[in-house]
Curated annotation (Swiss-Prot):
It comes from Influenza A virus (strain A/Hickox/1940 H1N1). Upon interferon induction, ISGylated via host HERC5; this results in the impairment of NS1 interaction with RNA targets due to its inability to form homodimers and to interact with host EIF2AK2/PKR. Homodimer. Interacts with host TRIM25 (via coiled coil); this interaction specifically inhibits TRIM25 multimerization and TRIM25-mediated RIGI CARD ubiquitination. Interacts with human EIF2AK2/PKR, CPSF4, IVNS1ABP and PABPN1. A motif (Nuclear export signal) lies at residues 137-146. Residues 180-215 are annotated as: CPSF4-binding. Belongs to the influenza A viruses NS1 family. This is Non-structural protein 1. Gene3D superfamilies: Influenza virus non-structural protein, effector domain, S15/NS1, RNA-binding. One of its GO terms (molecular function) is RNA binding. Residues 1-73 are annotated as: RNA-binding and homodimerization. SUPFAM superfamilies: Ns1 effector domain-like, S15/NS1 RNA-binding domain. One of its GO terms (biological process) is symbiont-mediated suppression of host cytoplasmic pattern recognition receptor signaling pathway via inhibition of RIG-I activity. Keywords: Eukaryotic host gene expression shutoff by virus, Host cytoplasm, Host gene expression shutoff by virus, Host mRNA suppression by virus, Host nucleus, Host-virus interaction, Inhibition of host innate immune response by virus, Inhibition of host interferon signaling pathway by virus, Inhibition of host PKR by virus, Inhibition of host pre-mRNA processing by virus, Inhibition of host RIG-I by virus, Inhibition of host RLR pathway by virus, Interferon antiviral system evasion, RNA-binding, Ubl conjugation, Viral immunoevasion. Transmembrane segments: none annotated.
Amino acid sequence: MDPNTVSSFQVDCFLWHVRKRVADQELGDAPFLDRLRRDQKSLKGRGSTLGLNIETATRVGKQIVERILKEESDEALKMTMASAPASRYLTDMTIEEMSRDWFMLMPKQKVAGPLCIRMDQAVMDKSIILKANFSVIFDRLETLILLRAFTEEGAIVGEISPLPSLPGHTNEDVKNAIGVLIGGLEWNDNTVRVSKTLQRFAWRSSNENGGPPLTPKQKRKMARTIRSEVRRNKMVD
């Protein structure tokens, strides 16, 4: 096993412990608490994959961080913080929408790389919008926290979430997963649209005038491609 993989996991465990203490003292905002819950699932998955105990890893991670802090000067810390790119957390969904339980009459699930796609194939002839909470860096989607598909009535009928056992995904991974979800929902004559925020940062427009990321012709072509992909890769339980 790569020692860097182990040390990275150990440090992540300790940093999660620190963030949990912050949350316990009611010092974390909604995005902070949201990431805390998601990262907990991710760490459990990584620990299972690596065969490492989280409690032991947390203690070792603390030692690693303490050693680094002893060697770190205040000036070096300032320089590091100044040079690091800052990411932003964007929210289409409220905490209630993110944490709400939902049920499927005809559940279908597909794993696409590091992302899990779930949808209810019993939903037909509905107008659906995709909303997501995610982080952005350099004006591009960096990390998807959670994406959900909502009907006009507010019912949840689909979801894309990162797999805890496979941390890390790219902007292309997210776009591909969205394409599969849209294709699956449109197969039952649903009308699907993507929120403006998600569309802006997942599909960056190359037009300087700020036009839409896809022309109507491009959208029709993408829809045909998606449907073809769905036929080849039917979503399985």
